[in-house]
A protein has these predicted regions:
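Structured, active/binding-site neighborhoods that engage oxygen-rich ligands
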Residues: 1-332
Length: 332
């Protein structure tokens, strides 16, 4: 493995003022930044504050664990790709588990002595990445066990929340692999912490939507249709937010936001607003993060407020991790 640092500088990527075919790199950046922007929007909404503030100055905004878990998913994939690009076979799922253990350590938690203690990487040293608010309970409890959950041996077959769903976008951003492998990576990573199919299937559906937009270049209708074999996500009817219900809220937000001929940034804002309205109580950050990821994968950085392309803090770290993934997948 060559290094643990994102390749390239963290200066803002150029905006695209005129519509046209989007490059893969722009869709990756748009997806990851859009997810973080949606997360910040949902956090403000959940706190009873004006969520539009998330779209003006993102440098010091709070985010939930949706953003940090997504970035640690990227880092786990980047580490596996670093090994592979150096000619060394690596277990992608093990790399992701180690990344999530590092995320757990970042939350101030301490796995049991028998758990691996992976060394810090570049992401762990970034003080600008604030500890995510309200870390997913199922994720924390599974990682605190010190055991590596698998699809055949789940740690908790009852864990059906959205903790695996919210971190699954990066699997849809890896090019040059078949869709079946992207789905396998998503499901194996979801099973590290969530044992119920109600949690893992929506994660695969979401990464499939992201892949259809960012890799396959489908339009929104085609991307949503490409995951139709798993069935449309259903709205929440239980007291606790579910993965399927939260994905349903995000998709409804995106459909509402794109129902107009407005510019991409306005569609982005509308999608976030509708997603948090449709979400179950307490699920606003996750639903808005998912909607933001879809909109970013669809429109690239055209969807984002300009501040996200130049701001310090969390957006700068997201940009760096996006470029690290791009570097390892394309050599650019």
């Amino acid at each position: 493995m060559t290094n643990d640092s994102p390749t390239g500088n963290t200066s803002p990527a150029p905006a695209h003022p005129t519509p046209g075919p989007l490059e893969y790199e722009d869709r990756v950046l748009g997806c990851l930044l859009g997810s973080a922007a949606g997360d910040a929007y949902g956090v403000l909404r959940a706190a009873g504050r004006d969520p539009a503030g998330a779209l003006r100055d993102p440098s010091t905004l709070a985010v939930s664990s949706a953003t940090s878990l997504t970035l640690y998913t990227v880092d786990g994939l980047v580490e596996a790709l670093e090994w592979a690009n150096d000619g060394v076979a690596a277990d992608e799922t093990a790399c992701l588990w180690l990344a999530y253990l590092r995320w757990l350590r970042r939350q101030g938690e301490h796995p049991p002595p028998h758990a691996p203690a992976p060394p810090d990487r570049w992401l762990d040293r970034q003080t600008g990445l604030l500890t995510g608010q309200r870390p997913d309970r199922d994720t924390v409890q599974a990682l605190l066990s010190g055991e590596m959950g698998t699809r055949s041996r789940p740690l908790d077959p009852r864990s059906a929340g959205a903790g695996a769903l919210v971190r699954s976008a990066p699997f849809g951003l890896v090019p040059r692999i078949p869709a079946s492998m992207a789905e396998r990576l998503t499901l194996d990573a979801a099973a590290l912490t969530h044992g119920a199919e109600e949690a893992t299937a929506p994660a695969a559906t979401y990464s499939g939507i992201i892949r259809a937009l960012a890799i396959d270049g489908l339009d929104l209708a085609g991307a949503l249709g490409s995951s139709a074999e798993t069935g449309p996500p259903a709205a929440d009817t239980s007291a606790e937010p579910t993965a399927a219900g939260t994905l349903h809220a995000a998709v409804q937000g995106v459909l509402a936001g794109t129902a107009t001929d407005a510019a991409p940034q306005e569609q982005f804002t509308l999608a976030l607003a509708h997603a948090v309205e449709a979400a179950a109580p307490g699920a606003s950050p996750v639903a808005a993060s998912l909607a933001g990821g879809i909109m970013g994968a669809r429109h690239g950085t055209n969807a984002l407020p300009g501040a996200y392309l130049s701001s310090s803090g969390t957006p700068e770290i997201v940009r760096a991790m996006a470029r690290a993934l791009i570097s390892q997948t394309t050599g650019a």
